[in-house]
Amino acid sequence: KNKKIKFTNSSTIENIPLRKNKIDLVIDCTGSFKKFDNISKYFKEGVKKVLISAPVHDDRALNLVYGINSYLLKNSDLDIITGASCTTNCLAPIIKVIEENLGIIRGSITTIHNSTNSQTILDNPGTDIRRSRSAFNSLIPTSTGSARAISLIYPNLKGKLDGYAVRVPVLNSSLTDCVFDLKKS
């Protein structure tokens, strides 16, 4: 009752009044701070825990998919927790069933994904000719970190999965296609 939750908006962590407002938990959904050096700025401002809505590829972060490896949170002393990515959350339950029952030798992942804010809305010159195409009018093949992110959830699959993405001009949807070479048929 009558509790206030403060929201802030800043492109730099140092400009957020975290210590002044005695903030001990930050939920970061910016997608901007995915490396430990950037995330650690929160701790310098007095924050105790950071929950990030994207994978963090660092041993100092615990990447979780609820219902798959979320039990690890109970005994973890790590201060950076991630909710992985939308594609990782889609893949992890599928991979759990297949890996536990059939075993995965290697695999390929394709994610058909809606446009993201890293894309341009109009064709323009750029260093990546594919990402320079209009997100409104193009099917854009690009990279995905999903195969690498899955190995954070399933370390035994590190180096066994590869993947790519196709960005498509839809508002909010995703489809993931997986092909696996299995130990058992």
Task: List where the protein language model places each region.
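N-terminal Rossmann-like NAD(P) cofactor-binding subdomain of oxidoreductases
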Residues: 1-121, 125-132
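Active-site-lining helix/loop region of Rossmann-like oxidoreductase modules
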Residues: 76, 92-185
